[in-house]
Amino acid sequence: FEDDHFLVLNKPFGIASIPSAIHSNTLANFVKGYYVKQGYENQQVHIVTRLDKDTSGVLLFAKHGYAHARLDKQLQSKTIQKRYYALVKGSGKLDPVGEIIAPIARDEDSIITRKVAKGGKYAHTSYQVVQSFGDIHLVDIQLHTGRTHQIRVHFSHIGFPLLGDDLYGGSLEDGIE
């Protein structure tokens, strides 16, 4: 979807949202190229929402600074709500509705990963199981805080890592038959 104020795109798995030292093939760079190709006067990319590289989903871009400020304000005041869906797998029982409240900190052994740790920052995740396929569950997730890798860390912490998330204990071999 696109109008004069914002652009909404479906980010595929495997593409980073924003450029970094190791990622130049990003959705933000794609948007910049799109703006140039369209001949837009304002070609500055204002990314409002981001997703991890190995996550697919909807991203929101503001097309000018005023729209970006307004959308940021709406996100802060929770008048725009973000929802996440994930497939998780575990051998125990996953409560049909639950909350995970566990502090998250940087993993001192890695520059990438995070972990649940006493000295970490407060993190709160709510979820509801939408459908189950044996030991695999589709969950509807709402974040009450926005810590790096929060969904991945929290579900791994309770023994239900995200399917395909080998960084936090999910197997790349698993799938739904």
Which residues does each PLM region occupy?
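RNA pseudouridine synthases
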Residues: 1-177
